[in-house]
Curated annotation (Swiss-Prot):
This is Large ribosomal subunit protein eL39. One of its GO terms (biological process) is translation. Keywords: Ribonucleoprotein, Ribosomal protein. Interacts with YIH1. InterPro entries: Ribosomal_eL39, Ribosomal_eL39_CS, Ribosomal_eL39_dom_sf.
C-alpha cells in the first residue's frame, strides 16, 4: 500500500476500519435478539480487502 493513496482507496479503507469492530453490548440485551457476535469481523493478517 503506497503512502500516497487515492481518495477512493482511502475511503474504502476508512469504511472497512469502521465496520471492523465488535458488536455493541446493548444490542445483545434487546428482547428476541439472536445476534451473538459480529460475523463479518476481519483480521488484517488473515483476510485481505482486495483493493
Amino acid at each position: 500500500m503506497p503512502s500516497q493513496k487515492s481518495f477512493r482507496t482511502k475511503q474504502k479503507l476508512a469504511k472497512a476500519q469502521k465496520q471492523n469492530r465488535p458488536l455493541p453490548q446493548w444490542i445483545r440485551l434487546r428482547s428476541g435478539n439472536t445476534i451473538r457476535y459480529n460475523a463479518k469481523r476481519r483480521h488484517w493478517r488473515r483476510t485481505k480487502l482486495n483493493i
